Amino acid sequence: MDFSTYDAPGALRDGTPIRIRAIRPEDGEALREGFAHLSEQTIYHRFFQSKRELTEREVEYLTHLDFEHHVGLAAVISNPAGELLIGVGRGVRLGGGRPGVRGAERDRTPAHAEVAFVVGDEFQGQGVGSQLLAHLAGIARALGIRYLDAEVLPGNRQMIDVFAHSGLPVTEQLRDGLVHVEMRLEEVAR
């Protein structure tokens, strides 16, 4: 399946319709604009540092995706002027398996992808991150990925809660000052 044309309906908790769609190269300006409206705390939670803007190189990386090794989804609200980007989720395949595993052993390990999310401040707590995660998990399964990994600051309870309530088997481990989250995709808790 060609995930570069991915598009699915969703809704905020208040019922406002949204779309979860593939990020496209022409989304660069919307990413810049959305970033400019993020609070310092949201930026720090996503990037683990303060930053004022996205560089050209970052925008290129975030919008030119192959949808096999690097998948990006945008949550958008349609309005008369076009679309309002309210959140982004992405997954990047980590080689053939766990980071740091080499050679034949790497080929025998399950495929992992690292995921990251950012949701505009006024839309946090509205289910956007959960929907982005659910759609990324579905795409990852179709691509043969068996685990989603994330690194989260311990103070980012909202994101940790999104993972914990995803319906996926989740393990958390505090390592080097970050919460390492691993979500197993081959089975879903019911």
Report residues per predicted region:
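Long, contiguous binding/interaction regions
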Residues: 1-190
